[in-house]
Amino acid sequence: VHDILQHNGIEYDQVLIVDADTIIHPDTPNFFNETDGKFGVVRNNGCYEWVTRSIDNWGNALFPNESKVKPWKYFNGGFQITNKSHIPFYKDVQNYYSSNIQTINQWNDKIKAGTDQTIINYLTQIHNIDTIYMDECYNLQDLFRKNLLHIPGHSWFNDELHFLKAGWIYHFNAIPKNPRDVKYWMERTYKELYGN
């Protein structure tokens, strides 16, 4: 993202990288004021089986000589606040992927836990990136497991957008297969917050 901003001559102090399956509430406070210039992330608060499997397997495959990332320090890759001081780190991440893409692709089908989030957690630890863990309200994730998505025939609570009261940035990940998929929730939330 830094390359894109630089190429287009856009000046910035900090930038938020957010996943495409998220919606930001229009009244969200200015989270840039909370980073102290550090790498801003939100701890992953979702399926810990997935997290620990990913940490163990990617650790064994790619980082066998490194300490395992602690699950309670593991952040969700869908919210990253960075600034120009992080450009060398992101270049190292790009170089790491370029140098290891065959191994990553080989292990991806076996691990089945994504190819970005855990690797960047390891690289953040290895490079000793000064990180600030921000409140979960800035990456409210795994909404289904938190009983924040009403699924007809499954949910006992009212069919309303409960998550709007629980955070500022809504991450529609880890939704089980059903007619109310990511597209449904993103469209419904967008219309609720921003109108048609």
Each PLM stretch: what is its role?
Residues V1-N196:
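Glycosyltransferase catalytic domains, chiefly GT-A lineage
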